[in-house]
């Protein structure tokens, strides 16, 4: 089916793709996205490797939090979830070149 030259070529392509993927993942780890909730009153800054860098809470929310702790918790969770969705979208967009031609099932996230 494949001669030695064909297999060697496939192996070289696979190795090159692996190196390119590693570089792309290293670059993505430096990219930051910001998730928000409450019209920007709570912000979560996260890298595309899911490391949270900052959480910013508007002073007005803190004043209300004394009376409504659950509201503050909900705002933080919503901002965090917004950041995660942005990380996934950014990662998918930047990694799409690697998935072309791989025939991955619909909904499969990459990198795995």
Curated annotation (Swiss-Prot):
Pfam families: YbaB_DNA_bd. One of its GO terms (molecular function) is DNA binding. It comes from the Bacteria. Keywords: Cytoplasm, DNA-binding. One of its GO terms (cellular component) is bacterial nucleoid. It is found in: Cytoplasm, Nucleoid. InterPro entries: YbaB-like_sf, YbaB/EbfC. Homodimer. Binds to DNA and alters its conformation. May be involved in regulation of gene expression, nucleoid organization and DNA protection. Belongs to the YbaB/EbfC family. This is Nucleoid-associated protein CV_1611. It comes from Chromobacterium violaceum (strain ATCC 12472 / DSM 30191 / JCM 1249 / CCUG 213 / NBRC 12614 / NCIMB 9131 / NCTC 9757 / MK).
């Amino acid at each position: 089916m494949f001669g030695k030259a064909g297999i060697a070529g496939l192996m070289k392509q696979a190795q090159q793709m692996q190196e390119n993927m590693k570089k792309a993942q290293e670059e993505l780890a430096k990219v930051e996205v910001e998730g928000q909730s409450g019209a920007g009153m709570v912000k979560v800054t996260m890298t595309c490797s899911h490391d949270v860098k900052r959480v910013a809470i508007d002073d007005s929310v803190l004043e209300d939090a004394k009376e409504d702790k659950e509201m503050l918790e909900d705002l933080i969770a919503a901002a965090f979830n917004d950041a995660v969705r942005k990380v996934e979208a950014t990662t998918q967009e930047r990694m799409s070149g690697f998935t072309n031609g791989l025939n991955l099932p619909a909904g499969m996230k990459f990198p795995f």
